[in-house]
């Protein structure tokens, strides 16, 4: 079944009459909740082992690694040991776009398998590349090529949205161009719901339009003026509605991300508690 389980309740019209089924939706909570380690990047720089232990103690089951930060100075083997020690899973990592066109792309895919990644996700394109529709097209084609190699290794390549991806170039929204030009059988998408809102987009509309493309999610709340993110439940993003709209959600990584909290570990704890208690 999709995301929700259903049960049938029956009532008799009269004794001995036909029984009429009535389908009743059962409220759902997330089985697993991940944390994007960018949310606690300073703590990870200072003491990655202690930080991962704290993240697990909060109740998080998954983390999203940051290859783009060099995994905070640790080798893939060290990261693997740390994850196993804490009982954490790392379904994905954020990687720099240049890794797709490097000569050792296959080596990166092998490392992804070592770390248990299902996805390598590019968070954004180089600044100079994102100002031109032609460069967006070029990168979409590179994603298709790199994605084909990734699929042969059992890994998915994916793309994450930033607020400025929604800023039109001429009459075209570059994010839309990228989604339309990439091959769904080779490239998946990670929806950052807060970034979508801050960029002026509607996460629900994109979920409806590309429901089969989104396989990973950043849950992020946003202040009413859309100036920055905030703790979950303190902004105006309808997270419950979004979660309820995601098909097969228990099969898809869902991460908390808050980019600039005053106390990152305290906010991570509050965000987990909020999301873990949410019925949808």
Stretches with model-predicted labels:
Residues 10-11, 16, 62, 82, ...:
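Active-site acidic/histidine proton-transfer and metal-coordination neighborhood
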Residues 4-12, 16-19, 23-34, 40-56, ...:
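Histidine-acidic metal/acid-base catalytic patches
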Residues 64-80:
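Glycine-rich, proline-tolerant flexible connector loops at the mouths of alpha/beta enzymes
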């Amino acid at each position: 079944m999709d995301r929700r389980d259903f049960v049938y309740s029956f009532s008799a019209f009269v004794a001995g009459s036909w029984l009429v089924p009535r389908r009743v939706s059962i409220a759902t909570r997330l089985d697993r909740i991940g944390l994007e380690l960018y949310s606690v990047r300073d703590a990870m720089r200072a003491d990655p082992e202690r930080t991962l232990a704290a993240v697990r103690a909060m109740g998080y089951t998954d983390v999203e690694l940051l290859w783009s930060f060099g995994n905070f100075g640790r080798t893939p083997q060290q990261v693997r040991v740390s994850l196993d020690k804490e009982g954490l899973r790392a379904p994905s990592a954020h990687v720099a776009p240049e890794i797709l066109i490097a000569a050792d792309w296959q080596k990166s895919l092998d490392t992804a398998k070592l770390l248990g990644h299902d996805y390598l996700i590019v968070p954004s394109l180089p600044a100079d590349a994102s100002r031109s529709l032609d460069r967006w097209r070029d990168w979409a084609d590179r994603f298709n090529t790199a994605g084909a190699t990734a699929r042969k290794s059992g890994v998915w390549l994916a793309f994450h949205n930033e607020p400025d991806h929604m800023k039109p170039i001429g009459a075209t929204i570059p994010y839309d161009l990228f989604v339309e030009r990439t091959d769904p059988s080779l490239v998946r998408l990670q929806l950052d719901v807060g970034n979508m809102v801050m960029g002026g987009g509607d996460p629900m509309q994109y979920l409806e339009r590309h429901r089969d493309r989104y396989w990973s999610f950043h849950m992020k709340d946003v202040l009413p003026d859309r100036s920055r993110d905030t703790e979950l439940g303190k902004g105006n993003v309808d997270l419950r509605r979004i979660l309820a709209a995601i098909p097969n959600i228990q099969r898809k990584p869902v991460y908390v991300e808050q980019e600039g909290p005053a106390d990152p570990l305290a906010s991570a704890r509050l965000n987990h508690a909020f999301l873990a208690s949410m019925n949808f």
